[in-house]
A protein has these predicted regions:
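A short, glycine/small-residue-rich beta-strand->loop->alpha-helix junction that serves as a flexible
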Residues: 8-25, 82, 106, 226-231, ...
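Active-site proximal beta-strand in glycosyltransferases
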Residues: 103-105, 118-138
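Donor nucleotide-sugar binding/catalytic pocket of nucleotide-sugar-dependent glycosyltransferases
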Residues: 134, 156, 160-206
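Acidic donor-binding loop of glycosyltransferase active sites
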Residues: 163, 284-298, 309-311
């Protein structure tokens, strides 16, 4: 039986955020193949001596020299930080899997220790980058400390170490192929449990539409802890709050959305972090979901989900990546165009 090892920072939650759902999708894909699926935590042994810790630190120093290269860490601060980050995990990973016939699924592409050590241990590496981190606004490379997008080449070189690479969007697949990586397109689709919920919402929406009267309503939805999403949500709030003659209601909700600058307006309702029940209630009621993001990488999972739920999506050009030219995804370039579409 094939052994699959995965280490992911995302909790496998079919009802969680986009990263968690993508992780569940990948897990369901592999478990369906009847493999030995190991969710690795890379935790240290509970009891270890000071001498053992010193040996690990020394081995880590040598591992970085051999497999990573100290020249990749720009500045003394980054070198010290790297040693502390890698110190205990590298030998643990290496000793545990050296010489074993395994396949390692690399999802958290900012986690370099597991990549380099699994490669050194002889594992087959399959990468599932949730997005190209170097192209996400505000992201900083942990080795060079470069700001996005100026460490794209570093990220590409790391992905070249992998045996297979599966990208979440058409655009990223195309870009990686231009760099000589034989990337394949593996789009997001909700885990089974989440898909069932969205199909239920679609059925309820179909019933509500038969009897709905009155003004329209739209939902601005997203996680305010995600920098591009937060920026886009705030831009939408600022725009709609400046409009004095809105003929429809705007709802704003999502994880930590209460931390946004919620400007008062008679036609805007702020719901903050939504319970599952409240989210379902809004998705059944509203006439569409509005999305705005600065240009970034990856693909928005909620566009797929809302299409399954029968929800029209109004997305700016940057947010609509991977979903252009679909009949129920309405793309706008300016807020003036958005108003016309609504």
């Amino acid at each position: 039986m094939e052994t699959i090892v995965r280490y992911s920072k995302f909790a496998s939650n079919p009802h969680g955020d986009g990263g968690s759902k993508r992780s569940v999708q990948i897990e369901e894909l592999w478990r369906a193949r009847n493999v030995d699926f190991i969710e690795e935590k890379f935790v240290l042994p509970k009891n270890y001596s000071v001498i053992q810790a010193m040996i690990w630190v020394l081995r880590s120093f040598l591992f970085i020299s051999k497999y990573v290269g100290w020249n990749k860490f720009i500045g003394l601060k980054e070198k010290v930080k790297a040693l502390l980050m890698y110190a205990l995990r590298l030998p643990v990973i290496y000793d545990k899997y050296k010489g074993k016939d395994i396949t390692f699924l690399w999802e958290n592409t900012q986690d370099l220790p597991s990549l380099y050590m699994m490669k050194a241990a002889g594992a087959k590496i399959i990468a599932y980058p949730h997005n190209l981190e170097s192209l996400v606004p505000t992201q900083v490379d942990i080795t060079t400390h470069k700001q996005s997008p100026y460490w794209l080449y570093e990220e590409v070189e790391r992905l070249k170490l992998c045996d297979e690479v599966y990208a979440i969007s058409k655009e990223e697949t195309w870009l990686l192929q231009l760099f000589g990586i034989n990337a394949k397109y593996f789009p997001y689709y909700p885990p089974k449990a989440a898909e069932e919920e969205f199909l239920k919402i679609k059925a309820l929406r179909d019933e509500v539409k038969k009897y709905k009267i009155g003004p329209k309503s739209f939902l601005i939805l997203g996680s305010a802890t995600n920098p591009p999403t937060r920026m886009g949500m705030q831009c939408l709030i600022d725009f709609f709050a400046s409009q004095h003659d809105l003929s429809y209601t705007i709802y704003v909700g999502g994880y930590k959305s209460e931390t946004l600058d919620c400007k008062p307006h008679s036609q805007i309702q702020y719901h903050g972090t939504l319970s599952v029940e409240k989210l379902q209630e809004l998705l059944i009621e509203v006439d569409g979901i509005i999305i705005n993001q600065p240009t970034t990488s990856g693909a928005l999972t909620r566009i797929v989900e809302n299409r399954i739920a029968g929800m029209p999506v109004y997305a700016n050009f940057g947010a609509a990546r991977d979903f252009y030219n679909l009949p129920d995804v309405h793309v706008y370039n300016t807020f003036e165009e958005l108003v016309i579409l609504l």
